[in-house]
């Protein structure tokens, strides 16, 4: 089983498309393992899209994803990364299959409704940005902090 991150961007949230978009994923037997509404900070957005930094559209992209609430989710299933990207469709709505999310709902190339991780490695990096409470490293730190409060300092070997 593989995990992937999906963000329903502010235009999808504002247009009330969360339920319709979720249906597309659930119809393909993808399991929603985490979901939350978020307001992305500029720093989190820049970290998420860091590979685009320096490109002419970068600042516009950051402004777009921080202009309103987003719905962040972790989906799990067989080949989840590839399945989700196929369900989402091409970023250009003219090229997207009509049955895809972007083919059905996207109004223009810039406001393309959804983001999906492009590889299992990207998925884990992106999940750590938007769901830090679910990362092992963070859970370990919380456990260590808890024991330090109870028993005093812990010595790492």
What kind of region is each of these model predictions?
Residues 1-157:
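Non-catalytic terminal and connector segments of soluble metabolic enzymes
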